[in-house]
Amino acid sequence: MAWSNIGLCANSPNSFSELPSPENFSFDKFNNISLKLELVINQRATGHITEVERIGEQYFLQRQDLIAVGVTAKSLPGTEDRIDVSSIAGVNVRYLQSSLQLAIDVPPNWLPMQSLSAHDMGRFSPAKFGRGGLFNYNVFGVYENESQQKEVSIDHEIRAFSEFGVFSTTGIFKSNFHRDVQSQQSSQYTRFDTGYEYANQARRLRLEVGDYIVRPLSWSQPVRMAGIQLSHDFSMRPDVVTTPLPAFYGEVTAPTTLDLFINGFKTDSMAVGPGPFVINDIPMLSGAGEATVIATDAQGRQTVMTSPFFLSSDLLKTGFTSYSASIGALREEFGNASNEYGAGGVVVAMRHGMTDWLTLETQAEAKDDLVVAGLGFVSNAFNLGTVDASFRVSNFKDQSSSYALSYSYQSRLFSFAARTQVEQADFYTLSHLPNYEKLNKGEEASLKSRHVSQVNMGVRLGDWGSLSGGYFDIQQTDSSSRTLNLTYSYALPFDINMSLSYNHSIGGQAVTLAQFSLPFGSLGGSAGLTLKREDDGDVRGRVGYSRLAPIKGGWGINLAHDLNEDPENRKQADLTYRASWAQFRGGLNGTIGNYDYFAEMAGSVSTLDGKIFPANEVYDSFAVVSTSGFDGIPVKYENQIVGVTDEDGYLLVPWATAYYTAKYEIDPLTLPANAAFSTTEQFASIHAGYGYLLEFPIELQIALSMTVVDENHLVLPLGTFGRSETGLVSQIGWDGFTYFEGVDPGSYILFYPQGQSPCKVSIEGLYERESQKIQTLNSQVCLKTEDEAAL
């Protein structure tokens, strides 16, 4: 009946005529209308909804609305607040009725500059530290067959660290034995360095108290002192780009993906909105090269932009400054005496980036009767290379000076460097202290004038290998030497690497050297052959095989045998074993019947988190990975397996690089099935000289599965909610099956069947708390309960 009524209404000839006629109807009402639309600028939705007045094909909106979505104010014509955007030259407007948007395309240069960084900042994290100590040791013993002399040395480092800094001391103990003396012949302990260091990473400041090496400039000499040194050290922040990097400018008309290639290798990918952009901090190596940006828009259209560059790592960015200031006593007889110190001295050095193409350098050093001052600069010579120059003056006697000038250029295929340095006679600095002290005592120790020049050049020949050469000229008052060397390297078939060298001392002898090496890939190790020919025609050689001990532990070997006309060719053989707690090496070298023997043990003992960890030598920082007591868990450092955790769930990683944000991982596949963990990888950087504990929280969960039935032995309804005494929740599945997992399920579980009273399953005593497997319980009866406390 309802359908027939509708049909009757639709077919009635008078039905529509009886409807009220619209008054003043006109299509102009749709052409002249106020709309609420989202503005889309150059295909980028802005999320900005505003009132747009449409009059025919004209669209009016407020000037401020355009500025709010990124159009620069200076690009808009006129000064009126209300703008007809459809009438602006160079602007295209479309009304997108289905999405209630107004699409406005403007010239890209009307939009603000977008600054993008191609430098990876994601891996930086503030350096961390722990509280503990470290003892590095190296025990080395040698037996010389000919003299039958035995020598044992113990090299050590003791280090303690906390939030207050790092204290360390190093030294060596030596003891000699002779065949004609039954007791110890001689023993000596020599201290090397003892000092305290505190670093402030945020301010990039390093304070050193005790023994230290003055941080020199490229044209000055290092000096050992004992006192105080304060330095501004950029190495604490490897994420901070100190070198002026080229910027890449461009513009796009729509949202685009940019792919950055440096010398043909893809280094980064980033998204950019419409408008002009600049890519800052482009990562690259020193020298000349080419940066290419491929821009791909949403329709897949690509635009390629290329720009050459030249980069020098010796330059500082504009406004960047590094410095060091040192005061203390000059160290004498280092390595031979423990506590020999001379007169006091002061050294101050500074580098400052004046512009992105000019860095100024200065250094001054002084003691009671000696002052040395110098000034230098590093410059980018119009992207054609780097120029480095310096000049120093010493007030010794009638004053003497030194100057240096160098030029270098490097590209993918070619490199060139030239340097000359001249020192007048008796040019003294603090590094010449032993000679200076002898002069004060009336001894002959004058320094000769010295002129050193060198030229180095290299070229890559593509599939034909590479060629490099150098010329060295050293001229002194009473002697001189000039040396020329050439080296050609080429990759032969079967992965054999060949290197041919020619060294000629002009006016002296010439030596030709041929070297071949063959890596064995997955088999490990490599074989090598060296042939050496001298001017007299004598040809000598050496053949050998070497395999490093794996970083995660294992055996290494080194074998060598001389090849010459002498029947008693020298031989060498040593074996290395790397354990998780130390490294052992032993071997021999010499001729048959006259071998010298040696043995070495090197490692460390550290303390952190109240635990003691024997491990291999720690040269810088170290990390201790904790897996909450689970043993045998593989640990990776920078995607490489470095060992497994011990019986207490710890592994020491001894080669962490200070301030480098490294990735540490654990492999959870060997964990029990009911182990719960929140993460399997962490990123961390560690202060220089420190140890840090990286904890991976892991908990064993109790996993219970069961079938639940009611008092009539019927399975509980599908989807019935359940909650344990400790708050663990689950639901009833098919056939009454349910599963609970957690650290502690408690002693009972409450279930809430829909439309029925709650019921309770007692599980106390039915499971093992230490089990590492999923425990399947027998079918459990859920008993109705009215205990509100239990609910």
Positions of PLM-derived features:
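Extracellular beta-sheet/turn segments enriched in Thr/Pro/Gly and aliphatic residues
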Residues: Q101-V106, L311-T318, K611, T680-L700, ...
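Membrane-embedded beta-strand positions of outer-membrane beta-barrel proteins
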Residues: F135-V139, T169-G171, L207-V209, Y323-I327, ...
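Feature captures outer-membrane beta-barrel proteins of Gram-negative bacteria and organelles
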Residues: S125-K128, V152-F164, Q184-Q201, G342-D356, ...
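Short, ordered, surface-exposed loop/turn motifs in non-cytosolic proteins
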Residues: F30-L37, R44-T50, G629-Q640, E711-T726
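Post-signal-peptide, soluble extracytosolic/periplasmic N-terminal scaffold domains
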Residues: W3-T242, D535-S606, P614
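A short, amphipathic beta-strand motif
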Residues: L39, G250, A623-T627, I702-E711
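Short Pro-Gly-centered beta-turn/loop motif in secreted/extracellular proteins
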Residues: E53-L61, I282-A288, Y650-A676, A688, ...
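Short, acidic Ser/Thr/Gly-rich low-complexity loop/linker segments typical of extracellular
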Residues: Q640-G649, T726-F737
